[in-house]
């Protein structure tokens, strides 16, 4: 039994499968007699107090502001590694996925805004379809195994990473609330300490965790979204130590399984529970639901593919050897899997009063529809365009 579990966890698609499973459990709980237990569990208050400092939040907020900050540490580590030695480490490597990612942020936001042009109460959700869920998208890609060209995997990974950078900028600029000067000063001091540790090539991960915890608490109290602390921590961990150690890689390997198999499934379970009670066709076709769903399915596909295509045709970028535009189109569809990142942005966009709670449900429904169709359609398109030549020849006879 243990051996079977180990084999499953080693699969490229394991994290995506686990995310989907926990999301389905959330939908099951939210639409059965267990729904009161589910929602009461998420609203259960949890508090931490150290001297005069205290944080009092419902469990759902601890998941979204606390555990997700750990996930953003991993994002920061991955982005830094890829920028320094990986898929986006120089202009030639970065420009093609960067342009695709730019289209994948601009066009979905435009699609959402156009659909919600006459619904001002929904317009603050414009950023929801901008994000790509790295774990889910790579999980679907992993289902096809070695038949997917390595260059295509790198393109998707680099694009999703740049996409996340864009989401981080959006969170920092548009989703910060009233700012606390004292907390910001505390956060600035913590950042300064992290930078000094980086310059001194401190390799003790526990030191970054302690200072990072202070930074997270300060950012949380400051009014800036706490997950940004995670990104800063990730960027401050050095790639190399004084004696050749690799603290960044070590920290990344330490966090990756926890994020993939604990934090993200927990986030999915906490946020994917959409009650369908009282929903009708008018709910399904509400501007908010349709804006999010079509932003992910249509906006992402058109944005990523059209910008990538034009970049090559205009001579700005080059297609990597071994991949073609059919495969780029299929991957563009996969980029419409927003799921966890889109759920996260929905919580930030509509995180206020009771009406906003109803808006979150509509947005989540759109995310589930758009991400689900993108995953299935993207998988079959990619399967078709990576099919061995012998199969294609047989089909053409």
Swiss-Prot record:
Keyword list, A-Z: Antiport, Cell inner membrane, Cell membrane, Ion transport, Membrane, Sodium, Sodium transport, Transmembrane, Transmembrane helix, Transport
GO terms for cellular component: plasma membrane
Localization, UniProt: Cell inner membrane
Segments traversing the membrane: 14-34, 36-56, 59-79, 95-115, 125-145, 154-174, 177-197, 204-224, 254-274, 292-312, 328-348, 365-385
InterPro entries listed in its UniProt record: Na/H_antiporter_dom_sf, NhaA
Main localisation: membrane
Gene Ontology BP, a term: regulation of pH
The organism's place on the tree of life at top rank: Bacteria
Molecular function GO labels: sodium:proton antiporter activity
Membrane topology label: Multi-pass membrane protein
Reactions this protein catalyses: Na(+)(in) + 2 H(+)(out) = Na(+)(out) + 2 H(+)(in)
Key word Cytoplasm present: no
Function recorded in the entry: Na(+)/H(+) antiporter that extrudes sodium in exchange for external protons.
Family: Belongs to the NhaA Na(+)/H(+) (TC 2.A.33) antiporter family.
Descriptive protein name: Na(+)/H(+) antiporter NhaA
Gene that encodes the chain: nhaA
């Amino acid at each position: 039994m243990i051996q079977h579990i180990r084999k499953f966890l080693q699969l490229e698609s394991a994290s995506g499968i686990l995310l989907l499973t926990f999301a389905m459990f959330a939908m099951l709980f939210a639409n059965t007699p267990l729904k009161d237990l589910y929602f009461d569990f998420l609203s259960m208050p949890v508090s931490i107090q150290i001297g005069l400092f205290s944080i009092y939040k419902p469990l759902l907020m601890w998941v979204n502001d606390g555990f997700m900050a750990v996930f953003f540490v991993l994002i920061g580590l991955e982005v830094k590694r890829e920028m320094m030695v990986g898929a986006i480490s120089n202009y030639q490597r970065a420009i093609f996925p960067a342009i695709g990612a730019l289209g994948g942020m601009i066009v979905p936001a435009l699609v959402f805004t156009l659909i919600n042009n006459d619904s001002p109460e929904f317009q603050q959700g414009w950023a929801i379809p901008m994000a790509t869920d790295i774990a889910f998208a790579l999980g679907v890609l992993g289902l096809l195994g070695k038949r997917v060209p390595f260059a295509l995997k790198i393109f998707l990974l680099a694009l999703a990473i740049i996409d996340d950078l864009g989401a981080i900028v959006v969170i920092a600029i548009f989703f910060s609330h009233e700012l606390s000067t004292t907390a910001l000063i505390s956060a600035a001091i913590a950042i300064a300490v992290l930078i000094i540790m980086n310059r001194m090539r401190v390799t003790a991960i526990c030191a970054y965790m302690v200072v990072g915890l202070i930074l997270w608490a300060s950012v949380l109290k400051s009014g800036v979204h706490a997950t940004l602390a995670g990104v800063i921590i990730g960027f401050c961990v050095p790639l190399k130590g004084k004696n050749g150690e690799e603290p960044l890689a070590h920290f990344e390997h330490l966090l990756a399984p926890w994020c993939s198999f604990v934090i993200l499934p927990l986030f999915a379970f906490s946020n994917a529970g959409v009650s369908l009670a009282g929903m009708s066709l008018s709910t399904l076709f509400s501007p908010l639901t349709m804006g999010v769903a079509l932003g992910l399915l249509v906006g992402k596909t058109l944005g990523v593919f059209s910008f990538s295509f034009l970049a090559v045709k205009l001579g700005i970028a080059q297609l990597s050897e071994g991949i073609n535009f059919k495969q780029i189109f299929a991957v563009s569809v996969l980029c419409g899997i927003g799921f966890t990142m889109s759920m996260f942005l929905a919580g930030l966009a509509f995180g206020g009063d009771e009406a906003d709670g109803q808006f979150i449900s509509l947005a989540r429904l759109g995310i589930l529809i758009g991400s689900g169709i993108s995953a299935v359609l993207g998988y079959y398109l990619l399967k078709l365009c990576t099919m061995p030549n012998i199969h294609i020849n047989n089909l053409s006879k």
